[in-house]
Each structure stands twice: as C-alpha cells, then as structure tokens.
Swiss-Prot record:
Family membership noted in the UniProt record: Belongs to the peptidase S1 family.
Any one GO molecular function term: serine-type endopeptidase activity
Gene: TMPRSS12
Protein name (database record): Transmembrane protease serine 12
Disordered: annotated segments: 24-46
Amino acid sequence: MRLGLLSVALLFVGSSHLYSDHYSPSGRHRLGPSPEPAASSQQAEAVRKRLRRRREGGAHAEDCGTAPLKDVLQGSRIIGGTEAQAGAWPWVVSLQIKYGRVLVHVCGGTLVRERWVLTAAHCTKDASDPLMWTAVIGTNNIHGRYPHTKKIKIKAIIIHPNFILESYVNDIALFHLKKAVRYNDYIQPICLPFDVFQILDGNTKCFISGWGRTKEEGNATNILQDAEVHYISREMCNSERSYGGIIPNTSFCAGDEDGAFDTCRGDSGGPLMCYLPEYKRFFVMGITSYGHGCGRRGFPGVYIGPSFYQKWLTEHFFHASTQGILTINILRGQILIALCFVILLATT
C-alpha cells in the first residue's frame, strides 16, 4: 500500500515537472519577495522596471557591451579602417559557409545572447539552409586557430516575415546556435537597445567592424577591420543628393559625408556599435544592410535599427528559452513516470 501511495506521489511530481518554470525564461533568475521592509513606491517602480527589462531581454538582461581586454575610449584600439586588435570587439561574428573542405566568410553577425546571433536577412538569400552555416566567434583573424575561438553550427535561421529583398526593408534575421557559447575574454555579447532612450546624433561614438572588402573593387580581408563613424541625419540621407527618400523609418545612415569610412561587401549583417556613456556599455544600434557602392561621397552605409524590432526579437528569445525548459521538464516527467511503473511492477 505504501509503495502504491509512493507511486501516485511520484506520478504527481512527474506531471508537475511538465509545467513548473514553464514561464521562466532560461538563464534568468526569478526574484522572490524581499526580506527587507516594504519598499517605497519609487523603489517598487524601479524593481518593476528591472523585472520588465529582464523579461524583455533589455539592456541589462545579462552582462553585455563590455570588452574585457580593450577600452576603445582610451585609445587602445586602432581606428580608421585599419586592423582591429584581438578581443577588441568580442561580439563580432563571422558567418561562414562551407565550400568543399573550406569555410568561407559570407557575412558578419553580432552575438546578442549565448545562443543568438543577429544579422541581415539578405545574407541568406542564396543559402537559407541552416546546415550550410557555421558561426565563428572570438577571433579577429578568420584564418587563424586560437583556443578561445569557437566554431558553432546553426540550428535555425529566422528571417523577419516582412523582409523585402528588392528594397531591403526589414533586413533583419536571427541565427540560432546549436549550442550555447561560453563567454571568455574574446567572446562577449553586446547589449540590445531595448528600453534605451538615446537619440543618436553626430556626437555619439559609433564604430563599424568586419571582414569585408577594404575598397569597392578590392578583396576581402582575413583580419577584422574597424573604423569610427557617426550618425548622419535622415534629412541628409534621404535628400535628393543622396538616397532620394528610399530609406524607411526602420533604417538610418551612418558613416561620414566624404565616404572615407564605410562598410562594404562582406560586412553585411555586422554591427554598428555605439557607446552610450550613461550605461558605460556598447549597444548594437544598427545592422549593416546596404549602400550605393562603398565609400562613395554622399552615399553612406544604411543600417537597420534593432530597436524597431524589439517585440519580434524578444518573442523569439522567449519562445526558444521556454521551449527548451518544457522539453527538459517533459523528459524529467517521463523518467519519473517510468520509475513509477518499475516500482509498481516490483510490488506485483
């Protein structure tokens, strides 16, 4: 009789595992009630904001936007279209496709979570099968071999449902890694600009980085390049002398008016990284999308703003994390149920 009751109890516990924690995203810590005295209304509102940022994957959902080895604002990085130092941009990813036995760089990407890389949707126009892709993370030399560099297969590619290839509207995509990457001094996520009320202007310190061509008719490089750029007003970018009104509200321009610093072919999908002094962190304020040529006067690079896609991005982050938790809990439940049957058989 006792064994029978034990079996029923185990069945109850097993079934409860199917649903427990289902609504708690992976990698987040649920905050219980504080043992401190009742907080003021201002303190309560601050807590609510922090919790909301955690749920939505905001600026401080995890430590992000800092490079352990370098500090760009102290002049330790080479700026101006030259070689980036190792560890300078630990969130920059090389997205590669295998041709024969060789992996070839196709597009850039940005590590925003331990299993998520942000990139441009048009990078996948000729290769939408995730099995074709590999993410190379934690290197400035894509031909080098280093213990801190990781090569991870892609589990899924998620393209924005309203992406239009002809106009590059909604040119945003997510690569879901097959396994979580472990952070180190050379691999760190950048912050997403959610709940960050910062208007970009010409004084905001922003940087581009990638393995693309160093000039319009030149060759790609195996050494990561970087340069400082600045935001260019929508009025100037959409003027008749520039893009003539084709830049949508979800995109913007950055570079410089003379075209001295710009992204080029092979840099697509990589980040526009801006340092926000209020947070003392870097944020991915743009995704490299397209441009008219490379480095042409009056035609700066065009970037997609991730902040316009907060709902779409967070839905995928949350869905993937809860799906993983549910799978684990179902497995636990199945194991416990199997154990119950073993106990029942042993008592008959």
